[in-house]
Each structure stands twice: as structure tokens, then as C-alpha cells.
Amino acid sequence: MNHPPPQAPFGRRRLLAGAGAALMVAALDGCKAVAPAPEPRPRPAPDPVLKLAPLRASTDRITQVTVCTRPFRAQGPRLDVERIGQKNIVHNYGHGGSGWSLSWGSSAIAVHKAMTFGEREVAVIGCGAMGLTSGLLLQRAGARVTIYAKDLPPNVRSSLASGIWSPDSRICFEEHATPAFKQMWASMARQSFQTYQSLLGLPGNPVEFIDNYFVSDTAGAARRGPAPEDSRPKFAELQLDLLGDLIPRGEPFGPGTHPFRDRYLRRSSFMMFNIAPYARLLMSDFLANGGKIEIAEFHSPAELATLREKVLINATGFGARALFGDESITPVRGQVARMIPQPEINYGLFYKGVSFLPRRDGLVFQVVGDDDYYGFNDDTTVPDRAEAELAVNTIAELYKTA
């Protein structure tokens, strides 16, 4: 709630005007004495408009540092059908940093294509964001489904994501964002967004909305994109133009209206995925609906011939690069530092190229860099402790009082 500004102090001009009027009354009355005006009591400084619970950002509270390899394709996700031997394979991979965000819409496209073959037994390869949503949507379409996967959550790449609604994050290069692609992408994003609304408020909060604060030391600062002289291709940015009605309007806060001293803030709201309970919910629903999960590892498409199902959905994410020899996949490294949860923290932060998310399954700190080329074409998966501590210490700066 906005507090009214403090009253102006009892200044010299006002005091003199009051004294002059009192003397005039005394002269006219000839007998009345006028008491001097009382000194005003000092008013306390107004409270900040924003009251945010303090974050205990300290490197000794880090519990885990993990690295995720995002599967970027310059032309966008692969959703075509390929026939290999006697198998019809529907591909559903290559979503960059948008996997969880687009999973329901993208998997709906893959499932529609898979069901056109008329088979009632369908296999899914992979048990991450795309694999689980493909399996559930196949069941809803009437299929009997088995998921074959080398690893299960939480030991899949999808479980190592930051957990933010980011449907156009490294989705493709700008030159490949044709009108047809934009239409498909918007459809996937909207279908996913609407599905997520049905998951709000469930036990464990698998999906929830949070307020996020972009913090800067100067007014009007924003995350920088590639420099004008940068000759590298630009990543497509689609959300503002095509999903503008789903994006709440931002709200600015100047110095003195928040706990972060003389900095500038802009508040926005977006969805966040608490990935551990969310993945558990998807797996539980899949198994409860009669789905089967088998541990299996495939090294080439030829090995898929051993499966009894004639129709398969390939949801192997970055794994498709090795399994199907898809060299169009470029790895994008993303590291997060996890920290002991603080249930009272219900807001996110972005400051100096570092993102903080208040996930209930562990607070998340991530260096995201100045632009989307940060971590591009880097397939290293060894955690970098120095980068993790940099992320935590950067956010910790906001809570220093001196």
C-alpha cells in the first residue's frame, strides 16, 4: 500500500505568518495573550513501499552445483516424422532453453502426428520434459504407452533447468523465425500456458506465479544484447510481439521505495516451475494411467528395431545429437547453484547478469551473462564452483546495508 508523503516541516515562512497573525489579534483585543505555537513532532521516515523478506544469500549455504546442456537448433525444434526400418519416428527435441515452457504444446504436435498411424501402442524415448508430457498426452489420446529411458528424474537434463517460464529462450535464430514458424511457436506457447494454469495451487506447488525484480544501479538499464558490430546471428525474440497479452505490465520502483537502497527496480510477474515436485507429479500421473517405464539405453537408431512398438516419439533432447547423429544441435551450457530453501522468500531477482529464483525445492542462483551467447557451444558439464559463488555473492550485494 502506498504511504502518503510526509508533511512539509513547520518552516520559517509558515511560522512567521502564524506569529504575525497572533500579534495582530493581541493588539486588537488589547488584553488577550497568545501562546506560542507548539514545536511539531518529527515524523519518522516513510516505510518502503516494497517489504521483501531478506534472503540469506551466503556461499556456505550452497547445497549443490549442477550443469544442464540445452539443445539449441538454429532452425528451431525438430518435429518431423522419419521412417527408419519398420519404425515411424516422430521427433520432439531441440527446444533450446524453452523445453519446460513449450512442452505441452510441442508434445501435442508430436502426439497428433504419432496417432495418425493408427497404432494403439506407442513408445516414447526419453523421460524429461518432452518425454513425460508426450507420454501423458498419448494416454489421453487413447494409446498404451511405454517410456524407454536411460535415466529418470531427477537424473535427466531437464531436471537441471532453472525452472522459469521462458518460451522463446534460444528457440531459434531470428533468420529462421518465418511467419509459419511464429504461428506454430505461438500455438505451442499458448497451449502450454493454458495447461499450466490447471496445475496452479496443487500440493507441492509444482507450478506457481512469482514477482520478479529487475534491479539496476542506474535508471533505465536493461540486459544488453549483442553489440551492434557483432556479426553473429541474432536469437529470435518472439514473446513480446506474439504473447503480449500474457505478459503482465511491469511496474517501476525508484530509490527509497524498496529495501535495496538507491537502486532502481522493475517488477514483473511470471510462472516458475518447482521442477522436483512437478516431475514427480508427471511421473505419478503417467504410471497411475497405466503407463510403463523401462530402463533402456540406445546407441543408434538401428537399436530401436528391437522395440515392439511401431510408432515412437523421440524426446531425447540433447541426447539426439549422439543417438541420431544430429549435428544441427548446438550445446548451450547452463549452470545453477542450489541453496537451502527459505519458505518465506516468494520473489525472484535479476541483477548484474545473475538470476535468482525462489524455488521451493531449493533456491536457484544462475549467471546468465549479458546475452544469449553466454554458454553457447559449450558442452562441458563439470560444475564451476567459482561461477556458483559469483552468482550468490552478486545477489548478496543487494542486502548489504553499508
Give residue ranges: language-model regions.
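N-terminal secretory signal peptides
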Residues: M1-G11, A21
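Glycine-rich active-site loop/strand segments that organize a redox cofactor
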Residues: L152-M188, L242-R249, P255-G256
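Short beta-strand to alpha-helix junction loop
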Residues: S98-L102, A180-M188, R266-L281, V382-A386
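Short hydrophobic core segments
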Residues: K310-T316
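A conserved short coil-to-beta-strand element within the FAD-binding core of flavoproteins
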Residues: K292-A305
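Flavin (FAD/FMN) cofactor-binding and adjacent substrate-gating region
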Residues: G18-G20, T59, V65-Q86, S158-L160, ...
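Active-site substrate-recognition segment that forms the wall
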Residues: P38-G85, G94-W100, A108, G128-A143, ...
